[in-house]
C-alpha cells in the first residue's frame, strides 16, 4: 500500500481522535480505495463513517459542532461535520445514505477490515463491500474506483 504523506498524516489524526469511539467506524470512499492498495484517483478528503452517538460525544472535543447534513440530491447525512485540522480535510458522517434507483440506501457496512499505517490503525469496509458501496454512489469517479479495486484481483 502506497499512500501520500498528506493522507497518512490525516489518517493518523483520525485514528487518534476516534480512539475513544464506542461504536465501529470506517474510512470510506477514495481514502478507503487507497488503503486497499488501488488507485483512487484524486483523494481530496477523508470520509469517515461514524455513529451519531460517537459524533455527538467526540467531535465537540475538537471544537466541532455536529449538524445535520445539507440537502443534496444524491447524498444525505443525519450528521455531517467537516474538520480542517489535518493535511487533508476530514468529513465525519453519521446516518449517511445515498440515493440509488429512486430509494435512499443507508450505508451500514457489515465488514470492518483493520489497516495499519506508520503508527496508526484505521478501518475500512472489505474490498467487495466497498465496491458495492461505490457502485451505488454511481458517479463516474466512483465507478472508476470500482474498476481499480476489481483490478487488484
What is each residue range found by the language model?
Residues 1-153:
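Compositionally biased terminal segments of proteins
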Amino acid at each position: 500500500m502506497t499512500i501520500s504523506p498528506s493522507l497518512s498524516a490525516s489518517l493518523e489524526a483520525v485514528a487518534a481522535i476516534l480512539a475513544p469511539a464506542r461504536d465501529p467506524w470506517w474510512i470510506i470512499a477514495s481514502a478507503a480505495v487507497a488503503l486497499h492498495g488501488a488507485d483512487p484517483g484524486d483523494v481530496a478528503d477523508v470520509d469517515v463513517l461514524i455513529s451519531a452517538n460517537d459524533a455527538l460525544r467526540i467531535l465537540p472535543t475538537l471544537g466541532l459542532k455536529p449538524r445535520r447534513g445539507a440537502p443534496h440530491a444524491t447524498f444525505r447525512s443525519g450528521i455531517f461535520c467537516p474538520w480542517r485540522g489535518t493535511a487533508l480535510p476530514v468529513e465525519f458522517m453519521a446516518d449517511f445514505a445515498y440515493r440509488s434507483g429512486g430509494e435512499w440506501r443507508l450505508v451500514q457496512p457489515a465488514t470492518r477490515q483493520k489497516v495499519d499505517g506508520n503508527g496508526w490503525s484505521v478501518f475500512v469496509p472489505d474490498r467487495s463491500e466497498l465496491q458495492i458501496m461505490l457502485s451505488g454512489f454511481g458517479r463516474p469517479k466512483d465507478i472508476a474506483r470500482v474498476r481499480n479495486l476489481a483490478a487488484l484481483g
